[in-house]
From Swiss-Prot:
Non-catalytic component of the methylosome complex, composed of PRMT5, WDR77 and CLNS1A, which modifies specific arginines to dimethylarginines in several spliceosomal Sm proteins and histones. This modification targets Sm proteins to the survival of motor neurons (SMN) complex for assembly into small nuclear ribonucleoprotein core particles. Might play a role in transcription regulation. PANTHER family: METHYLOSOME PROTEIN 50, METHYLOSOME PROTEIN WDR77. This is Methylosome protein WDR77. GO terms for cellular component: cytoplasm; cytosol; methylosome; nucleus. Component of the methylosome complex composed of PRMT5, WDR77 and CLNS1A. Found in a complex composed of PRMT5, WDR77 and RIOK1. RIOK1 and CLNS1A bound directly to PRMT5 at the same binding site, in a mutually exclusive manner, which allows the recruitment of distinct methylation substrates, such as nucleolin/NCL and Sm proteins, respectively. Found in a complex with the component of the methylosome, PRMT5, CLNS1A, WDR77, PRMT1 and ERH. Directly interacts with PRMT5, as well as with several Sm proteins, including SNRPB and SNRPD2 and, more weakly, SNRPD3 and SNRPE. The modification Phosphothreonine is found at T5. Coiled coil: none annotated. The gene is WDR77. GO terms for molecular function: methyl-CpG binding.
Amino acid sequence: MRKETPPPLVPPAAREWNLPPNAPACMERQLEAARYRSDGALLLGASSLSGRCWAGSLWLFKDPCAAPNEGFCSAGVQTEAGVADLTWVGDRGILVASDSGAVELWELDENETLIVSKFCKYEHDDIVSTVSVLSSGTHAVSGSKDFCIKVWDLAQQMVLNSYRAHSGQVTCVAASPHKDSVFLSCGEDNRILLWDTRCPKPASQMGCSASGYLPTSLTWHPQQSEVFVFGDENGTVSLVDTKSAGCAVSSVVHSQCVTGLVFSPHSAPFLASVSEDCSLAVLDSGLSEVFRSRAHRDFVRDATWSPLNHSLLTTVGWDHQVIHHILPTEPLPEPGPKSAAE
């Protein structure tokens, strides 16, 4: 395993305190989501999960090392409720899953100092827990604690289809990066469904989640169009080929629930897994651990790989930390018997 090395930081003197006029004065404590943009800018979603109101906010940092310091953000905006999930729509659109039950689309202005609301639609009857943009970039999928999945036309600002195929709360949806009509969903009914919206019966059940533990997170392999990975409430991560009946590989990675999974942009991609055990694990193609960080002091909620530096992985959590991890640029060979212990 690799030891953690802190990334080079931009000297504080080189940064300029310049809070945009419409940005909130203070970021909520719980960081729920993080996404790098193609140019290396970092988007954060924050929530306040205490008190009488569940507030939330969105923040853009052109310098990711300055996050989560509000004074160094490029743009920020208060949301009506907590942010459960978010994702980029192109380079300027931001799709948000809200604790209010709304799916929200926000957009950066031309100067990227304002985040402007494009729509806020209350089509779900409970917290929207997850959103994902289909590979076309014009449609998206949302999943909610109301057991429903909805397919959206973002340009028309409307729901195209609504499905109630799960008999429990939907915990994750993941659009295929390879096919614009295909996505995955999982829920608290202990099922993983493979969807193809072109079919008369669009959902088919994957027979890989019969462990008795609820699936909590999903992601597609970036290069193999029939392969995906899921994590469960027990901390197990499993690799699945949709063309075969069961799991190809499984590994108990965490001691608590898996909260997020994301593949790296490497030619042989790493898999980052984050968890309620407050740790980050990075796995190779065989789900063997190559890196572990326990730097967070509360639930780790999301991870995102830098598009500019493939060795840089950023995590956020409920401890209000944005932590940058440096990894090897490519997977390492298996260690020999004389390798020094960490």
